[in-house]
C-alpha cells in the first residue's frame, strides 16, 4: 500500500455499496451455520448484532429484547446517571436464574404504591418484608384481582397479601431443578428463598424458566441474567457515571466519542482499566476509522474497538467537518491493528441491508452495531408518528441539534462531539440530523430477517462459522451500473419484502 501520508490521494475509500462478495464452492446448509462471534475479549454473542447507544434506539426495553435474541443492547447516555443506572438494573432484573436482590415492599405501603413499584420494574408482584428483611408474605396481581381500584389509595399491602404461613418457600442452596419442581408441584409462580432466620435472600419465578425455553440463545452472564452495555463519555461526571453503572451490574461500558483517538477519551479508558473494581466489566472504545486510531485504543487497554466515523444515515460529520472514511475501508484499516492484537472489532453504522453484515465481517469486523435498522422496531424508544396514513418512528443522530440541545435539561451527548464546553444551544455545531424511519414491528422479526440474510451469506461463501466467513470471503468492486443491477430494476415493485425496502436504496 502506498504511503498515504506522502500521497494524499493514494487511498481509495470503499463502502458497502461499492463491493459485493464472490460466491464460493459450498456444502454449507444455511440453517446449520454458527453465527456466534466475539463482542469483546471475554463476551461471546450468539448473533453478531448490537443495538446502538442512541436515544431513539436503545433503552431498557430494546436492550432486553436484543439480549433475548442473542445480541446485546448498549444503553444511550443522554440520561441522568440515576436514570441510566436504573435502566441497567431493569435489564438485569428482567430475567435471571435467581433474583438475588429482589425488589420488596413493606406491609404498610398502599396498594397504589405497590402498583407504581410493579409498573416501574415491570413485575407482577413483590415479596413483603418487615424492617429486618423477614419474609412476612407476598402480593401479586392474583391477590388484587377482585380489589376495586378506587380502594388502592387506602388499602394496605398487609390487607391483601398472601401471608407467610401460606407460602411455598425454598432454602438457601435450592437448585434450579428443585425450584422448578416446587413451583410445578404447588402450582405457584414465585418461590421466595429464605435463610435459617426467615430472611429473604432471593426470588425464583416461573417466568424465568419459561423465558429460558422461549429464548434459548439469550445472552446471559454467569448468574443467568441478561447482559447489557451502556455508553459513557470522557467529560465531567463520566467517572461517577461509570461507577454507578458498574454498581448497577453493567457488563460492558462503551467509552463513546465521535473521535476515539482523542487524548481525553484514551485517558478515560486507561483510568477505568486501571481500577480493579472494573475487572468484571468489559471496555469498548470508539469510534475510530484508521489503523492508528484502533492501535491507540488497543494500547489504552480496550477489550473491543468500535469503528465508524460518519457512516450513519443520520450523521453529517463527513460533510460538516469533512472528516471520515467510507466504512468498508475503515473496517479494513482498523482490522490491521485489531487482528494481530486479538481485539474484536465492531463495525458501527452505515448498514442498510442484511447483506452488509457479511461484507463488514469479510472486511474485518466481528460484530456490527445497528441504528436505523432497529429504530423502527416496537421496542425502540422513538416516538410513533403517522405520515400520509403510514406509521413511522422518530430517529435522530446523537449529533443532531435535538439530541445535543439542553432544552431545559442537561444534555449528555454534547461531549460525544467534543462540544461540552459550548455555553448555549445556539452555539452548537450539529453533526447529525433528525428524521423518521418506517415502523417495522417487533424486534424479533427484524432480527430474524437480518440473521437469516447472514445465514445466506455464509451459505454462498461456504462458511459455517464467522471465522470462516473472514477466511473465505473475497470482494469484487462494482460500478454504479453494477449497483443498479444489484437492486430490483426495470419493474414497478408492488409488494415489498420484509427484508428489502426501496426507501433504503
Question: Where are each of the predicted segments found?
Answer:
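Catalytic beta/alpha-barrel core
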Residues: 75-78, 104, 125-127, 147, ...
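Short beta-strand/loop segments at the ligand-binding rim of alpha/beta enzyme cores
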Residues: 44-51, 97-102, 221-231, 273-289, ...
Amino acid at each position: 500500500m502506498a504511503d498515504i501520508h506522502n500521497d494524499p490521494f493514494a487511498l481509495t475509500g470503499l463502502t458497502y455499496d461499492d463491493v459485493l462478495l464472490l460466491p464460493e464452492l459450498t456444502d454449507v446448509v444455511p440453517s446449520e451455520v454458527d453465527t456466534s462471534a466475539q463482542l469483546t475479549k471475554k463476551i461471546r454473542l450468539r448473533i453478531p448484532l448490537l443495538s446502538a447507544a442512541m436515544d431513539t434506539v436503545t433503552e431498557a426495553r430494546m436492550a432486553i429484547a436484543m439480549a433475548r435474541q442473542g445480541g446485546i443492547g448498549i444503553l444511550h447516555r443522554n440520561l441522568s446517571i440515576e436514570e441510566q443506572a436504573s435502566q441497567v438494573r431493569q435489564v438485569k432484573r428482567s430475567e435471571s436464574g435467581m433474583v438475588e436482590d429482589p425488589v420488596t415492599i413493606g406491609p404498610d405501603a398502599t396498594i397504589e404504591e405497590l402498583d407504581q413499584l410493579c409498573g416501574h420494574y415491570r413485575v407482577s408482584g413483590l415479596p413483603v418484608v418487615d424492617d429486618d428483611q423477614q419474609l412476612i408474605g407476598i402480593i401479586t396481581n392474583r391477590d388484587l384481582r377482585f380489589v376495586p381500584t378506587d380502594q388502592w389509595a387506602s388499602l394496605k399491602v398487609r390487607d391483601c397479601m398472601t401471608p407467610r404461613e401460606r407460602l411455598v418457600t425454598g432454602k438457601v442452596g435450592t437448585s434450579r431443578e428443585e425450584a422448578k419442581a416446587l413451583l410445578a408441584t404447588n402450582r405457584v409462580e414465585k418461590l421466595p428463598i429464605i435463610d435459617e432466620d426467615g430472611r429473604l435472600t432471593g426470588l425464583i419465578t416461573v417466568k424465568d424458566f419459561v423465558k429460558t425455553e422461549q429464548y434459548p440463545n439469550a445472552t446471559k452472564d454467569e448468574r443467568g441474567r441478561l447482559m447489557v452495555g451502556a455508553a459513557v463519555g470522557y467529560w465531567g461526571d463520566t467517572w461517577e457515571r461509570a461507577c454507578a453503572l458498574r454498581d448497577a451490574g453493567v457488563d460492558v461500558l462503551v467509552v463513546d466519542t465521535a473521535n476515539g483517538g482523542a487524548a481525553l477519551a484514551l485517558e478515560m479508558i486507561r483510568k477505568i482499566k486501571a481500577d480493579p473494581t472494573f475487572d468484571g466489566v468489559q471496555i469498548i472504545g470508539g469510534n475510530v476509522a484508521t489503523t492508528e486510531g484502533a492501535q491507540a485504543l488497543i494500547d489504552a487497554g480496550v477489550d473491543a474497538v468500535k469503528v465508524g466515523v460518519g457512516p450513519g444515515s443520520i450523521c453529517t460529520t463527513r460533510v460538516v467537518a469533512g472528516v471520515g472514511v467510507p466504512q468498508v475501508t475503515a473496517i479494513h484499516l482498523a482490522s490491521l491493528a485489531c487482528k494481530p492484537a486479538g481485539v474484536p472489532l465492531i463495525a458501527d453504522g452505515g448498514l442498510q441491508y442484511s447483506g452488509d453484515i457479511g461484507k463488514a465481517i469479510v472486511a474485518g469486523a466481528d460484530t456490527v452495531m445497528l441504528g436505523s435498522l432497529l429504530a423502527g422496531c416496537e421496542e425502540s424508544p422513538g416516538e410513533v408518528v403517522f405520515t400520509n396514513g403510514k406509521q413511522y418512528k422518530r430517529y435522530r443522530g446523537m449529533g443532531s441539534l435535538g439530541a445535543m440541545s439542553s432544552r431545559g435539561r442537561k444534555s449528555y451527548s454534547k461531549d460525544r462531539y467534543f462540544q461540552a464546553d459550548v455555553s448555549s444551544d445556539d452555539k452548537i455545531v450539529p453533526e447529525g440530523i433528525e428524521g423518521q424511519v418506517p415502523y417495522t414491528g417487533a424486534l424479533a422479526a427484524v432480527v430474524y430477517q437480518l440473521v437469516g440474510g447472514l445465514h445466506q451469506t455464509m451459505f454462498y461463501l461456504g462458511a459455517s462459522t464467522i471465522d470462516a466467513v473472514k477466511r473465505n470471503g473475497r470482494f469484487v468492486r462494482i460500478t454504479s451500473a453494477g449497483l443498479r443491477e444489484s437492486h430490483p430494476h426495470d419493474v414497478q415493485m408492488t409488494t415489498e419484502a420484509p427484508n428489502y425496502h426501496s426507501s433504503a436504496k
